[in-house]
Regions:
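Non-catalytic terminal extensions that flank enzyme cores
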Residues: 2-55
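M16/insulysin-pitrilysin zinc metalloprotease superfamily fold
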Residues: 81, 116-158, 162, 252, ...
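His/Glu-based metal-binding/catalytic segments typifying zinc-dependent metallopeptidases
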Residues: 45-52, 57-59, 167, 171-172, ...
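M16/MPP (pitrilysin/insulinase) zinc-metallopeptidase core fold and M16-derived inactive scaffolds
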Residues: 48-133, 175, 196-199, 327-343, ...
Length: 1009
């Protein structure tokens, strides 16, 4: 048996895979195994770790050299059928029948990555099989190219338009000020190099891509000697190599004519073709430059102005310097920018996506004539910080922040292994050792030693990266209403030029063939080629995280509920202190979101806000405000469950909270400071409050387009009940009107309101929740009674009942909602969002289980075909929510959102007559089960368990829901379709988020910002 961890085997091969190196990776408690196939050049790096969530990722170096978006269209198209899996979209079939915890495809400026992850052994290999066949043996037929990339469509009047999934997705990208700004800033830093090109594609360039160019791209880049396969998890290396050897190696050798061993197959470093190496070269500026561009005015509050410096290859010292200068609002550079009154939002840091990194210091919301003032401020601040030096408190807070970040595991975009993959690919892609970036903890320990022994260490970094760094790129982006006008004009010209050489008969033939291809419904026999996990092999018992309820003596002598979640948190504890806001008059609810944002940012105990933030950064990992809303189901099981502790008044409440996370070694200081924060909160600093208002407006405007679906969903459902109305008031379009009012009301008036709300919430009593590991709990639990006393937490008072009628006056433009069931949110955007909601069955019922299965089936079959494949939207979805008793449909980045509204209800009607094959239903149940078993990080498991408990959801109920899912039959699903269709005809609510130029009949809603 070949031992891949025996260093004596380095230089030996296993089934033609040469073992090049074995790396110890103590920072991740793992080993790294680097291999290269001697004949194909195929490289593998396996991080072997005791983690059942295994991940694979095929990576190809696909270097952008233009804005055609070829890599992006290829990423979509490879997943649309292959030799072994000749379906329309095996990716969709796979994702709808597998237990994946992550399944995606990602396009970067320099690479394309195809990752998948699962906690189930057989399911992992099923996904690996489909993906390997897709990337090496795709169909790439013409129909796929024009469906995913671009095509001309002709309406009934003969009018031409450009369509395509990628085309419409990227139109959404070009609708956002911030998206365009960051792309253009990178363009300024790396002119005529691959980062300066839009790897996703510019919609004005995408239609110029030919089918021949598309095929040549795959031939050029999708070769085994340009493929890097990243593996992670506990499945043995030998088993993975056996799989590849049995399923793919001989086929790859035959297709790519790999007869002999490749040159330099035993190279210790990654092999990169000369042609690709040339494409990867970065053209760095040799002297300072200035660039000004225009960007869409949607999402902008003024100009974006920045200064930028090249900083070289990746290293930890730049991360440390960035944390010192910009880590929080009180950090020296952040403070100077935020208090300058020259802009409303800071954008600073070391940007490390490429082989050459760069520091950027910038401000959003700058007035047109103030750009030189910003540059003067930045230069002045650099020299002042350098000359005065960095205070010890800023260094300590930076060290605390980085230590905390390196210890805490987070699940940002998929499993934590995705973050490790990114680190590996950054070095591997560029010809460096795969483990180069896998020593963050040990690298930072070296930095800390340098800080201790060299008092000028931080100062010298400022000199190195700023004072002595003479190439400076100054960049300005100006929002302009002409941006869309010019792009729309260019699009019209593009269509005219395409029309000149157009054979309309050939176009009609191509479109007829495409539509026929799209409308083909694959039979169970056809889809049976996709490997699946059998329903009978699944474990029907769910993980049961437990939050225990204890009581500690409150400030008033009462019993205060203490919720304790024991999880493996690696010496970190997470503490939540919640106070109900549901005893307030409804007119105050609208202020809760911003209040939760500012309560830890205004200062406390008569200290300035920056002094307070600096103090907390030296003690805690973070401290923040939040709000939590929800409701209790009225079903008997839930009411019985809550009966034991009902008199303690914590079930089904609406909460304002203050949370923190800290190292257990800092528990005493953390609890003391948190009690001080809660009891001495300040609401006096008008200047700071004004700055936070401007930041809020900037943030809301920046994410308006990206949040379009959220706004549409909340608007559509806002009259279904009190909780939905509250959600619209707190998070919907109505909240944007509240945000606008902060600029109209006096700052003192708003602060008085906030202070009143905060004090009233504290008077209403509170509860405490902690998530920590056993050792941490043993230390911290004995300290919590003193903390509760110091924080003056008292017995919870009962909630006041809130009705829908009481909330309606605080829903903006509510008078027209009941008269017109289509809510139309108008905003400058080149794509839109659609949302429809209708009634569904109640929590814990067998009917709700069948509706969940129906929704999942609809999402991956009918709606995927009609909304995405045929309609050209980037995506669509369906959800049956039994707690809310709603069925919801939606689309996003949709070229025709109003039409999608019709498709949803038509689709529901169509499937009422459908007979569902048993195999289809079982596959869908398997997919839904996959959603249940996605690994949850310990801190999140504790938070979820606590939230479930206070809203009356016990682990037993989750088990009942899963049992009900397992028992769903095809007839149950058919009955669900008929039931939901009948309910939708009696009541449905619709909303779309679309361009102002779209003419739709309904209640038109203007966005105030």
């Amino acid at each position: 048996m070949f031992d891949f961890l025996d260093k004596n085997n380095i230089g030996k091969d296993y089934k033609n895979f040469l073992l090049i190196s074995i790396d110890d990776i103590p920072d991740y408690k793992a080993k790294g195994i680097y291999l290269r196939h001697k004949k194909t050049g195929f490289e593998i790096y396996h991080i072997l770790k005791d983690d059942k969530e295994n991940l694979f990722a095929f990576c190809f170096r696909t270097i952008s050299k233009d804005n055609l978006g070829t890599a992006h269209i290829m990423e979509h198209s490879t997943l649309c059928g292959s030799e072994k899996y000749p379906l329309k979209e095996p990716f969709t079939t796979l994702s709808s029948t597998s237990l994946n915890t992550f399944l995606n495809a990602l396009t970067y400026p320099d690479k394309t990555v195809y990752p998948g992850a699962s906690v189930v052994h057989d399911d992992y290999f099923n996904m690996l099989d489909v993906y390997a066949d897709a990337v090496f043996f795709p169909k790439l037929d013409y129909a796929t190219f024009i469906q995913e990339g671009h095509r001309l469509e002709m309406d009934e009047n003969g009018k031409l338009s450009i369509q395509g999934v990628v085309y419409n997705e990227m139109k959404g990208n070009y609708s956002s000020f911030h998206h365009v700004v960051f792309d253009e800033q990178i363009n300024a830093m790396f002119p005529n190099s691959y980062p300066s090109f839009e790897s996703g594609g510019d919609p004005l360039e995408i239609p110029k891509l030919t089918y021949e160019q598309f095929l040549n791209f795959h031939q050029k880049f999708y070769n085994p000697d340009n493929c890097l396969l990243f593996l992670y998890g506990d499945i043995p290396t030998a088993e993975q190599l056996d799989f590849f050897d049995e399923r793919f190696i001989s086929r790859i050798e035959k297709k790519y004519n790999c007869k002999n061993e490749i040159k330099n197959y035993d190279s210790k470093l990654p092999l990169i073709k000369d042609e690709i190496q040339e494409l990867k070269k970065l053209n760095l500026l040799e002297k300072s430059s200035y660039k000004k561009v225009i960007a869409p005015d949607s999402g902008a509050t003024g100009n974006f102005v920045s200064m930028n410096w090249y900083t070289g290859k990746v290293d930890m010292e730049k991360y440390y310097l960035s944390e010192v200068l910009f880590g929080n609002d009180s950090s020296p550079f952040s403070l100077a920018l935020k208090t300058s009154n020259l802009g409303d939002d800071v954008n600073c840091g070391n940007f490390g996506q490429f082989a050459e990194e760069f520091f950027s210091i910038g401000l959003f919301g700058v007035k047109k004539d103030d750009e030189q003032k910003v540059y003067d401020l930045i230069e002045k601040t650099i020299h002042k910080i350098y000359e005065d030096g960095i205070c010890q408190e800023d260094i300590d807070s930076a060290i605390m922040g980085i230590d905390f970040y390196l210890r805490e595991v987070n699940r940002y975009f998929g499993p934590p292994s995705i973050q490790i993959m990114e680190k590996v690919l950054k070095s591997w892609m560029n010809g460096n050792a795969c483990n180069s970036n896998l020593t963050p903890i040990s690298s930072f320990e070296k930095i800390k030693q340098k800080i201790k022994t060299d008092k000028n260490f931080t100062k010298n970094l400022i000199k190195k990266y700023f004072i002595d760094n003479k190439v400076i790129v100054k960049f300005v982006a100006e929002p302009s209403s002409k941006f869309f006008e010019e792009r729309n004009k260019s699009e019209s010209e593009l269509i005219k030029n395409l029309e000149k050489n157009l054979d309309k008969n050939q176009l009609k033939k191509d479109l007829d063939e495409l539509h026929q291809y799209q409308q083909h419904i694959e039979t169970p026999e056809e889809t049976s080629c996709i490997p699946t996990t059998k329903l009978s092999s699944l474990n029907s018992k769910i993980e049961r995280p437990v939050t225990n309820l204890q009581f500690i003596k409150g400030f008033d002598g009462s019993e205060i509920p203490l919720f304790v979640s024991k999880e493996e948190t690696n010496g970190i504890f997470y503490l939540d202190v919640l106070f109900p806001f549901d005893r307030l008059e409804p007119k105050y609810f609208q202020y809760i979101p911003f209040l939760s944002n500012v309560i830890t940012n205004l200062g406390w105990n008569n200290k300035s806000w920056d002094e307070c933030i600096s103090e907390s950064a030296c003690v805690m990992g973070d401290v923040w405000g939040k709000f939590t809303t929800g409701k209790l189901s009225d079903v008997k099981e839930v009411q019985d469950y809550i009966s034991k502790y009902k008199d303690y008044n914590f079930y089904g409440r609406q909460w304002l909270g203050i949370s923190c996370k800290a190292l257990t070694s800092m528990a005493d200081k953390t609890l003391s400071l948190l009690a001080e924060i809660i009891t001495t909160m300040s609401f006096t600093d008008k200047n700071r409050f004004g700055t936070l208002v401007q930041e809020l407006i900037s943030e809301k405007k920046a994410f308006l387009v990206d949040s379009g679906l959220d706004y549409a969903s909340k608007r559509a459902k806002c009259l279904l009940g009190p909780l939905q109305a509250l959600s619209e008031i707190l998070n919907g379009i109505s909240q944007l009107y509240t945000v606008e009012n902060y600029t109209k009301n006096s700052l003192r008036e708003s602060l008085n309101i906030f202070e009143y709300i905060y004090k009233e919430c504290l008077k209403s009593g509170g509860i405490v929740h902690i998530t920590a590991d056993e050792d941490s709990l043993n230390k911290i639990l004995p300290l919590l009674e003193k903390f509760v006393q110091n924080a003056k937490i008292t017995k919870l008072l009962p909630a006041k009942k809130i009705t829908l009628e009481e909330l309606k006056p605080y829903i903006s433009q509510n008078d027209a909602i009941e008269n017109k069931n289509i809510q139309i949110i108008n905003y400058d955007s080149q794509t839109g969002y659609a949302f429809v909601s209708s009634p569904a069955s109640e929590y814990l019922s067998k009917e709700s289980a069948s509706e969940i299965i129906l929704a999942s089936w609809l999402k991956s079959h009918t709606l995927w075909d009609k909304i995405r494949t045929t309609g050209g939207a980037y995506g669509s979805g369906v959800e049956a929510d039994s707690l809310e008793k709603t069925l919801s449909f939606w689309s996003y980045r949709d070229p025709n959102p109003e039409k999608s509204l019709e498709v949803y209800l038509e689709s529901l009607k169509e499937i009422c007559e459908k007979d569902f094959p048993k195999e289809d239903i079982e596959k869908t149940i398997v997919s839904c089960y996959g959603d249940v078993i996605v690994p949850v990080l310990p801190k999140d498991r504790g938070a979820r368990s606590f939230t479930s408990m206070i809203y009356g959801i016990s682990p037993d109920f989750k088990q009942i829901n899963l049992n009900n899912l397992f028992e769903v039959t095809p007839q149950d699903v058919k009955n669900a379709a008929k039931r939901l269709y009948d309910l939708s005809q009696k009541q449905n609510q619709k909303a779309i988020f679309c361009n102002k130029s779209d003419k739709s009949i309904g209640n038109n809603i203007k966005i105030p910002l």
